[in-house]
Swiss-Prot record:
Residues 151-239 are annotated as: Disordered. Plays an essential role in the initiation and regulation of chromosomal replication. ATP-DnaA binds to the origin of replication (oriC) to initiate formation of the DNA replication initiation complex once per cell cycle. Binds the DnaA box (a 9 base pair repeat at the origin) and separates the double-stranded (ds)DNA. Forms a right-handed helical filament on oriC DNA; dsDNA binds to the exterior of the filament while single-stranded (ss)DNA is stabiized in the filament's interior. This is Chromosomal replication initiator protein DnaA. Domain I is involved in oligomerization and binding regulators, domain II is flexibile and of varying length in different bacteria, domain III forms the AAA+ region, while domain IV binds dsDNA. It comes from Corynebacterium jeikeium (strain K411). SMART domains: AAA (SM00382), Bac_DnaA_C (SM00760).
Amino acid sequence: MSNSNFSIEEHFPDMWDAIMHDWLADSSSANPDPDLPVISPKQRSLLRKVTPVGLMGRIVVLETPNKWTKESIEKDLIDPIKHVLKTRLDLSVSLAITSTNGESENRAEAADDSHTRVDAVGDTHEGASQKGSVATADDLSMSQVEELVNKAEQRDGASQAGVSSAAETAEEAARRREHDADELAGQYSATENHIDPNPSPTPTRWTNKETAHRPAPRHTSPHTPSPQPSSSFNDGLDGESLLNKNYTFENFVVGSSNNFAAAACRAVAEAPAKAYNPLFIWGESGLGKTHLLHAIGHYAKELQPNMRVKYVSSEELTNDFINSIANDTRESFKRRYRNLDMLIVDDIQFLQNKESTQEEFFHTFNALHQANKQIVLSSDRPPRQLTTLEDRLRTRFEGGLITDVQTPDLETRIAILTKKAESDNVQLPEDVKVLIASRYEKSIRELDGALIRVTAYCALSHEPLTVETAEIALRDISPADQDVEIVPQHVIEVVANYFNLTTDELVGKGRAKKFVQARQIAMYLCRELTDLSLPKLGSAFGGRDHTTVMYAERRVRESLSENKKVFDQVQELTQKIKSHARD
C-alpha cells in the first residue's frame, strides 16, 4: 500500500480488526479510556463474532454468524460502534448488519424483512433509541453486499470456504482476525489474553461521552511504551486536534540536551504567534521532538480552551491533500488547515519530492502566518539541510526560531528511566538505572526498549530486578554491537529464514497467522535495531503505511512481557541479525 494511494474502503477490514482489538482490550482494563465506550463481557463476546465485510461510501457492512447475534448487536451496540468509528476514523457511518447462518434461513426471513437492516439514522438522530435507529434502507443493494462479501473472501484467501464456512467458526475467525490485524493500527493497550488480577467492576451501560467532561489522562500500563502519535485513529488522542494525551510538559524530562528547546516550546504555548513563529525543532529520531510538539498543543489549549490546534505528520498531511483532490474537496481541505490557531507538523522532511503537497503547504503556511497564527514544525535536520524542499519553503522555516534536541547526557538518561519506571509502577533499583543509562546513550527509544526487555525478562522468569538479571536480559542487545550497521533487509532475511518463509512472503500481503506474526516481529526488530523512521520502515515492508509498523511494534512489546516464547524468539533473532550484518 503506498501512502499516496491510501484508501479507507480498501483497508477498512484491517482497520476494523485493529480498532476492535484495542476497544475490547480497553473495556476489560482497570483504567479504561474515557473516550471509548465501556462495554460488558457479553457485549465484548458479541463483537468478537462480527466479521467486517467492507465499507461502501458511508455504510459499514458487518457479518454475524446467526440471527440472534445480529439482533443483539442491533439492540445494544449500534451507537457504541458508530461512536468508536467516529472517534478513531472520523467517519459518520450507517451500519448494515447481515446474518450468514444458512442461506435458506435468510431467504425465508426475506418475506418478512425484505431489505438488509441498516442503521440509517446518522448523526442527526443520535438521541434516538438504539432499537429505533435500525431501519430498513435501500442504501445498499444485495448485489453490493455480495460484491463486498466476495472481496472479503478473496482478501482472506477463503474463496472455497464461502461466507459461512463450516471449516472456520465465528470464534476461530475472531481469533484469526486478532492475529491478522497488522495492516493498520490502533494504539497501545493491554492484550486481550492478559488476565487482570484485579478486574474492574462490571461496567455500566454505555452513554455518549462526546459532550461530557473528560477525566484526566491516565498513565500507560507497565511494560507498554509511550504511544506513537502518528495515526489518526490512535488510542489516547484528543478529538480533532489529534494531540496524544500522554505527551505533556509534565512528563517530559528536561536536561542540558533539550533545555533550550523545552523552554522555547513553553514560550510558544504561552504566547502563540507572539514569541517565535514559526518554531522549528530538529534532531535525530528518538530524542523527544514529537513529545514536545504534543506538549505545546496541550499547554496552549489548557491556557486557551477554545484554541483551534491541529497536530499532523507530514505523511498525514500529504494523504489528506491527495484525498481532497481525489474527492474534489480541496476547499474543505483549505478550511480545515487555514482556519486553525495553531498548526503543528511533524517530520516535515517527508514532504520531499511531493511537489503538489509542498505547493499547497506553502500557501497554507502563508495564510496562517499572515493571519498571525502559530506554526510549529519538526524535522530530523535543520532547514538549510532540507535540500529536497523548495527554497521558498526553507526560507520561511528559517524565518522564526530554530532549536534542536540532542542526545541526552547520563544524568538526563537516568532521570528519564526514573520517570518511565514510575509511570509504569516498576520499582527500578538505582544501580539498574545506572547500568541501562550508561550502556544506552544514543536515544530515548533505546532506553525505553532496554527497560522493557529488563522488566519483561524479570516478569517472565520470576526473577528479582537486579543488576545481574538486567545484564542477562540485555546481553543480546549490547551496545558493543552498535558499530554494526543494520538495515531492514538484514532483519527481513533473518526473520524469514527463522520462520521458514521466503522474503516475499514476509513482506507480502499474506494474512495467514504464520505470516502476520513473523512480519510483526520483523517490524519490531527493525524499529529497535535501525534508526529509520516509521514511513521508511513501512516502505521496506511492501509499501505499508507507517501505522502498520506502529501496530506491529506495540503488539510485540505487549507480548514480550507476557509470552516467554516471543521473548526468546526476539532475543535469538537479535543475535542472528547482528551476526548476519557482520558477515
